[in-house]
Design a protein with these regions (language model features):
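Short SAM/SAH-binding signature in class I
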Residues: 331-337
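Non-catalytic nucleic-acid substrate-recognition regions in nucleic-acid-modifying enzymes
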Residues: 4, 15-170
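A short, acidic, amphipathic alpha-helical segment used as a generic capping/interface helix at domain edges
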Residues: 118, 322-326, 353-361
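Conserved Class I SAM-dependent methyltransferase catalytic core
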Residues: 32, 38, 42, 46, ...
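Conserved S-adenosyl-L-methionine
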Residues: 208-328, 342-343, 347-349
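S-adenosyl-L-methionine
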Residues: 19-26, 33-47, 51-57, 64, ...
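A short, flexible beta-alpha/helix-coil linker loop
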Residues: 133-136, 192-193, 339-343
Length: 408
């Protein structure tokens, strides 16, 4: 990580020639995010509208919606806050340069122009994530390799050494996006996907991704004025995301390393202020407000393990029981992600299963609301209830639908 802090106005040394350094004026060599305070949020298409609302509440402005993403403007403190708090975004990117890119030589040449020693040392590791669409460069892996070569050669020419690539746990993640022969190179502000919260210590087959669960909780409108119950909680992802949302716990509270720490203008004091303010804003979870159950002993154990890693997780009760055996859940929000073909491994008895679920909701959940996520929407028709609404939620590799039922 660079030890220079742009906010002080002190010139940094940049390795501009092999084995030789010299100072340069910062204003002339600023990157896009520095000049324009402009950033890019990657988000699933069906979650984009609510992600935009979330961005605004976290301090973003001047939103511009594009395919699978949102451009936004933010002060540095809000950029840190968004990366730390967002529950819906996949990644937040700080763009460095954009350029016309019609072939591999353009990629290599422009990537070599970036002062990579400002973002990492030759002893640190990096990885490239690349996305290519409607371009003369047709393979994202090939495009990423050209950027990798440019970075490696940049350091080799100046230090006689090449930094290593680490796809699993890199110090720096560089994002390459090419669309219609126009490329942008960015730094991943979180050094990895934001759905990785850090509380998942145990899992079950085909677990729900955290950003999907967070989107469901947000779409439910749940504000803690009624109890929340998940009768098929699996490893507890919906319960955990409901807890974090209610308690106002930052989504990345367990992440200790962020990509924005590698940026040349990183401000440690400002980042500390964001964390302190977030900690003061946390509120406790009343016992009994969030609870769940599952027929599987393994799932219940996994859910308890994951919840105990969270603040106030001990206030969430999880029991082992078949939802068909639950006497009743009145005046509550019932939210769940039932088993489907992918999770069950076969379609046997699933029609009857969903009929039983509908009867349970209708007969034992008086004066409640139910939000049911169907990873395979073909099963919606087998629930003997009339939905209030159905909304697509294609995120985390699932082409699913969230269905709301009002129960009287």
């Amino acid at each position: 990580m660079s030890t220079f802090v742009r906010d002080t106005g002190v010139n940094r040394k940049s390795i501009l020639q092999k084995g030789q350094g010299r100072t340069r004026k910062l204003a002339k060599l600023a990157y896009i995010y520095e000049r324009e305070s402009r950033y890019f949020a990657q988000v699933a298409e069906t979650a984009k509208e609510m992600a935009g609302e979330e961005l605004l509440t976290l301090g973003a402005r001047d939103l511009s919606f594009v395919f699978r993403g949102i451009w936004f403007t933010a002060a540095k403190k809000d950029f840190y806050r968004i990366t730390y708090h967002s529950r819906l975004l996949s990644r937040v990117l700080a763009p460095l340069i954009s350029f016309a890119c019609t072939g591999k030589d353009d990629l290599y040449r422009e990537a070599r122009k970036i002062r990579w020693e400002e973002f990492m040392t030759v002893k640190q590791t990096f990885s490239i994530t690349a996305n290519v669409s409607e371009s003369g460069i047709t393979h994202s892996n090939f495009a990423g390799l050209r950027v990798k070569d440019a970075i490696a050669d940049y350091f080799r020419d100046r230090t006689n050494r090449r930094p290593n690539v680490d796809a699993k746990d890199p110090d720096l993640v560089i994002n390459l996006h090419i669309h219609r022969d126009f490329a942008t190179l960015s730094i991943d502000a979180s050094t990895g996907p934001l759905y990785k919260r850090g509380y998942r210590e145990a899992s079950v087959s085909a677990p729900m991704q955290e950003t999907v669960a967070a989107a469901i909780i947000r779409m439910s409108g749940w504000d803690g004025t009624m109890p929340l119950y998940d009768p098929m909680c699996g490893s507890g992802t919906l319960l955990a995301e409901a807890l974090m949302a209610y308690c106002r716990i930052p989504a990345q509270v367990f992440r200790t390393r962020f990509g924005f720490m590698q940026l040349p203008d990183f401000n440690p004091g400002l980042w500390e202020d964001i964390q302190v303010a977030a900690k003061k804003d946390i509120q406790p979870l009343p016992p009994g407000l969030i609870s769940g159950s599952d027929i599987s002993e393994h799932a219940v154990t996994a859910a308890k393990t994951n919840l105990m890693g969270l603040h106030f997780g001990g206030n969430v009760s999880v029991a082992q029981t078949d939802f068909r055996q639950i006497p009743g859940i009145a005046d509550s929000l019932v939210v769940t992600n039932p088993p489907y073909g992918i999770r069950m491994g076969k379609d046997k008895d699933l029609k009857g299963f969903y009929q039983d679920l509908g009867l349970f909701l209708r007969e034992r959940c008086a004066r409640s609301f139910a939000l049911v996520y169907f990873g395979e929407p073909k099963y919606i028709k087998h629930v003997p209830l009339a939905p209030s609404w159905k909304k697509a939620l294609t995120i985390g590799g699932l082409d699913g639908k969230l269905v709301k039922y009002e129960l009287y």
